[in-house]
Structures are given as C-alpha cells and as structure tokens.
Amino acid sequence: MDTREFPLDRTRNIGIMAHIDAGKTTTTERILYYTGKIHKIGETHDGASQMDFMDQEKERGITIQSAATTAIWHGFHEQWKDTPYRVNIIDTPGHVDFTIEVERSLRVLDGAIAVLDGAAGVEPQTETVWRQATTYAVPRLVFVNKMDKMGADFQMSVDSLKERLDVNAKAIQWPIGAEDDFAGVIDLIQREAWYPDDKLGTEWEKRPIPDDLKDLVEEKRDELIEAVADVDDSLMEKYLGEEEITVDDLKAAIRRATLALKFYPVLAGSAYKDKGVQLLLDAVVDYLPSPLEVRPYTATDPDTGDEVDLKADDKKPFAALAFKIMTDPYVGRLTFLRVYTGTLKSGSYVQNTTKDTRERVGRLLQMHAITRREIDEVFSGDIAAAIGLKATSTGDSLTSVDRPLVLESMEFPDPVIQMAVEPKTKADQEKMAEALQKLSEEDPSFHAETNSETGQTLISGMGELHLDIMVDRMRREFNVDVNVGTPQVAYREAFTKTVQAQGKYIRQSGGKGQYGDVWIEFSPNDEGKGFEFDNAIVGGAVPREYIPAVEQGLKEAMQSGPLAGYPLVDLKAKLYDGSYHEVDSSEAAFKIAASMSLREASKTAGAVILEPIMKVSIVSPIDNLGDVMGHVSARRGMIEDQETHGNTVTVTSKIPLAEMFGYTTTLRSATQGRGTFQMFFDHYEAVPRNVQEDIIKNAGKE
C-alpha cells in the first residue's frame, strides 16, 4: 500500500474566487510560481497563463473551467522546510455565466480566498460568489489585490466587506503606500514591515515600520484584536482582564474565529507586481482548515435512510463525490473526485450509488492545470481525477462496493437563454450530437435538446457568453461547424390556481380496446420546486402498476405548456381517483388519460408565462446617470440601489432578460464606451398581460 505523502493536518483544499478581472488567475499563477510548480510566470493578458488551459480562455483572458492543481508550500521564511504543506487549488471563473463552476467547486472545498480589486472593493459578482460560499459554510480569507492600480484604496475595500456583505472582516496586514507608491506590506499581528528585495518578489527584507505608519498600525492592530475578541471567548477574557495578548494567542484566536465563519482576515498585495502572495500562502496554512477541521459532510445510508457523518479518515470505507467531468484530448473522459473518507487504488471497483451501478477506476491522476501525474492511490481529503468511469456524471456519489452511501448532491440552476443550432453539413450532423452530449455531461447548466416535431436542436445555458463558448468548443474540440440562430429567452409556463380535472381515454376499434380514467388535482408549487407527484389513490381505483404511467404521462405533457408551448414548471399533481377496465386498461392508456387531465385543467388553472428576471449592475460615469436610469425604466426594470464611487456610479436593478438583448451597444454609445454592465439570473416571474399576448402571438399558438 502506498503511504500518504502529506498528513491530513498538513493538507489544504482551497478555491480562489472573485469578480471577473479582480486578478484571480494571476494570483493562482503566482502561488504556483512561489511553490515551485512553474519556472516561468505566465500573464493572463499575454494568453500564457498555466491555469487557463482552454483555447478560449487564453484568447479571452477569462477563466471558464475550474482547473485543479496541487502545490507544495514550505513557508515564506522556510518555517515549514521539513514539514511542508500540500495545497490543492481550484481556480474558479468570475464571469457570471459560469456560476455553475463556482458552485461546483465550493461544494468540494474546505476553504477559499476571495480576491478583490483594490480599486473597486466588493463588486456585484463578489456578492454572488460570497453567498454561494456561505451556503456551503466555507471559511474565507480576503486578498485585496491590485494595490498598485490607479485608485487602489485598501481601507475602502475593507469597509466594503462590512457595507455590502455585512461580515466581520478586518485587516491582518496593511499596505505600505498605494498605486505607484505601493512598496510592501506590514504584518499587523507581528508588527513587521516587509519589502520585496528582487523583481519577482522571491526575496523579501524585513525593515522597521515607517514612522508615518506607526500610529496607524497600532490603531489597526487594536481594531483587529477587538473584532476577533468579539467572537472568541478566550481572547475576550484576556482582553477584558488586560492580560498580555501574545502573537500566538492572536493567531490561534483568528484561526478559531475564521473556521467558525465568524471572522474573515483581510490581506493586501498585488499578484501582478509579485507582492504579498507568499504571505497569503502563509495565511492559507495559518487560518484555513485542513480536511480534519471542516464540519463533516453528511451522507445517507440507502438501505436504512440514516444519516452518516463523513470525517476524513483513511481507515474508513471509501466515499467521494464526482464534482466535474472533462474530456481530455489525450486520455479521454476525466472524472474529478473529492475523496471524503477512505482510500482508493487504481484498478479497483467503486459503487456509483446515485446511478446504482458499479464501475472500475482505470487510472488515477493528480492534476496540475494541464499536465498530470499518474498515482496509484488516493487518500481521504485528496482531490484527483479518475479515468474509466463511463456512467458517472457531475454530482454522483462514488463509494466502496461493501459500504454504499449517498452523498448530498449538487443543485444546478436552470438555463435562462436558448438558441437554435444546426450543423453546416450532413457530416457535421452526427458529430454535433456527440459533441452536445459530451458538453452537457461536462456542464450540467448547459442543455441540448432536439424538438421531435420540428427536428430543430436548441441549446440553452446561463448567458450569451456561455452559449458562444459552447459553440466555439464544438468547433475547436469536436470539429463541428454549426449555424446559430439568434438567442431566445427560455420562457416557462405555470399554473396559478388549484383545479381538479378528469382525463378519460377510451378507444374501441376491433380487438383489444384502450381504457384509462384519472381524476387529478393540480396546484401551483413554490418557485424552483419543480414537479411533485402525489399518489392519493385508496382502494385500488387505479391499480398500482399504472401509477408510474400516470406520472410519466404528466411529465411528458408538461414539456409543452398550454399557452405558447413552453415547459410547464413548478406544479403539484395529486392523483386521487379514477377507474380502469380489467381487459382494456394499459400503461399507454393511462399515460394518455393523464395528459388529457392536464390539458383539461389548463383551461381553468390561470396559466401564466414566466420570464427570467436578471439582476443587472450598470457602472457608468456619473454624468450619464440620467441615461442609465432611463435605460432601466425603458426595459421594464426596477432600480434597487445606486452607489457613487468618485466620478462613477453603480446602478443595481432587476430587468427581464428579454429586454437586455443588444444593451451592450446602447450603453456604449450613451457613455462613449465608458459604461459597463454585468447581469446574472435572479428569479422567474410572470410576464405582464400585454407581453404575454405578444409571446403567445409570436409562438403561433393564438
């Protein structure tokens, strides 16, 4: 048996998350450089970054797929020279169309670094990823990056954490200067000033704290101690008893408070200028949890329904979550795993409890962005990739064959935008089907379906960029050229009233007839709850073997709603009565009866069309505020908030997606190219009646 290279207490599984352009990938690059993983630093804006390994990422300078990497850290002062730490890093995208990747990564991480742009502080997408991290109870450090940038303001960035996220966050470092004068950082805990000694920031020199910063350092250190003492009893005792608080006391209290999600340490630096990244790595070791310190993951025993806590332990049976599927040009299908308990050797079998199948793991790989190292065994707390799992998809539980468990799965958002694609040539037809299947396996927020009546293929996803990139990947990775239609909004339909309806199907045409009869009560379900079927039949009015056919008949009928043919969603159906015929009843007859019942109900159930409402954040020069407010109201939008930073203003609003097509051009021309906007899905809501009539008319169902 292989022995574990790094004990669990010296392992960190972390993610790097941020708003687009806050410098996340550059920060990861520097971490890899300082931990000895790369010998040459790649810049994102040169298209040479190690973590951004897909062609589109290199061209667009944004991170799309979260790559997993392993790095080894000996400490800024080589303090862990003989006992280094292993840091597994997942680089996540900051672009809103790819929130699925962030969600997917956070589910399997133990800690995270939130990167802020020092000139902007907390931005809209920061709020989204922060909320996601809170959902999964992930402890975080905050790295205020780009301190060398025009307008960089560390105090503003720290304050924005309290103002916009309402969290207890305080600086544990202070920058020496800002913008062009950003020279180094002061460690508030140790009261030390650090200046880089060479261009790439590998050598640093400790100097006395500059005189003009001494008072500020003491003031900020006191603020730090108070903020931590507020949430940590043992530090509070020392603080109130006016006992001496040593460096070790303070560090231990910061660690406890960070792991308890009661405190978020804030650090300063500039990854691009090679300042502050090693101290950030030290903070990862000092303040983020090992797999032993996170709250145990919950799994369920499929036989008893009992909950089981999964605590990292190599001696326990194997349990892991498949959190990402990728197609690799050289080795084929890769399944990324987060191992919670136990160990797994290559060549052994695992039980996929989500799909109830057994699969053999061919090979195991440790990934470094795009290069890989073959390993014989993975241990609890590890992140690795497996080859050979053909049936496994994202969110599946993989456990030992002798001890099957089902891990809490991942939830994926429904797509909000769709467009038609068609292959350019007959030869592309088959390749397109294969490409779409592989892409939707990799990305659960990307869907592809072919309409059986029209033969048209629709792809749907989280935004225009998302779909652009998928079409691009079809061309590059699968050699499929497609023509694309204009993007369309993914509307839905829903009932607003509770109604009861009968569906009775009788057919007599010589020989065996058909008979199915059901009474179903339909009622609206909460948003996002989907379809819920309740079998309330007593006394066998509908025999048990036909119940699944009724449910299936409803599901199929819901694919095309009564108003304009959009999917019917969020519906409860209670089957409470019906009748059958000894000879003529069949599954097919009950399926048809169920769909007739739904069609009948839709006449009186107050059906409405739902549209995706986006949260839109528009940043523009303050002189154009009037234009922007006009844009929002002209697009059926509601303004929620506006904030002024210097001579720019940020307007946050909710606007229907249908009104946002082409807005980039409108905003650009109104602001001479200086305005930008970001939008992400917020919720679905009913469209106004006049809009609904237009949608129905356009769908040709009037």
Swiss-Prot record:
What species is given as this protein's source?
Oenococcus oeni (strain ATCC BAA-331 / PSU-1)
What gene is this protein a product of? Answer: fusA
Predominant location category: cytoplasm
Q: Name one GO molecular function term.
A: GTP binding
What protein name is recorded for this chain? Elongation factor G
- Cite the InterPro entries for this sequence: EF-G-like_DII, EFG_II, EFG_III, EFG_III/V, EFG_IV, EFG_V, EFG_V-like, G_TR_CS
Q: Entry's PROSITE patterns?
A: G_TR_1 (PS00301), G_TR_2 (PS51722)
A Gene Ontology biological process noted in the UniProt record is: ribosome disassembly
The family database entries (HAMAP family) matched by this protein are listed as: EF_G_EF_2_B
UniProt lists the family membership as follows:
Belongs to the TRAFAC class translation factor GTPase superfamily. Classic translation factor GTPase family. EF-G/EF-2 subfamily.
Domain (tr-type G) ranges: 9-292
Q: What does this protein do?
A: Catalyzes the GTP-dependent ribosomal translocation step during translation elongation. During this step, the ribosome changes from the pre-translocational (PRE) to the post-translocational (POST) state as the newly formed A-site-bound peptidyl-tRNA and P-site-bound deacylated tRNA move to the P and E sites, respectively. Catalyzes the coordinated movement of the two tRNA molecules, the mRNA and conformational changes in the ribosome.
Sites where the protein binds GTP: 18-25, 91-95, 145-148
Cellular component annotations (GO), alphabetically ordered: cytoplasm
Mind telling me which NCBIfam families this protein's record contains? EF-G (TIGR00484), PRK12740.1-3 (NF009379), PRK12740.1-5 (NF009381), small_GTP (TIGR00231)
Subcellular localization(s) per the UniProt record: Cytoplasm
Q: Tell me the PANTHER family matching this sequence.
A: RIBOSOME-RELEASING FACTOR 2, MITOCHONDRIAL (PTHR43261:SF1), TRANSLATION ELONGATION FACTOR G-RELATED (PTHR43261)
* Entry keywords, A to Z: Cytoplasm, Elongation factor, GTP-binding, Nucleotide-binding, Protein biosynthesis
Would you say which domain of life the source belongs to?
Bacteria
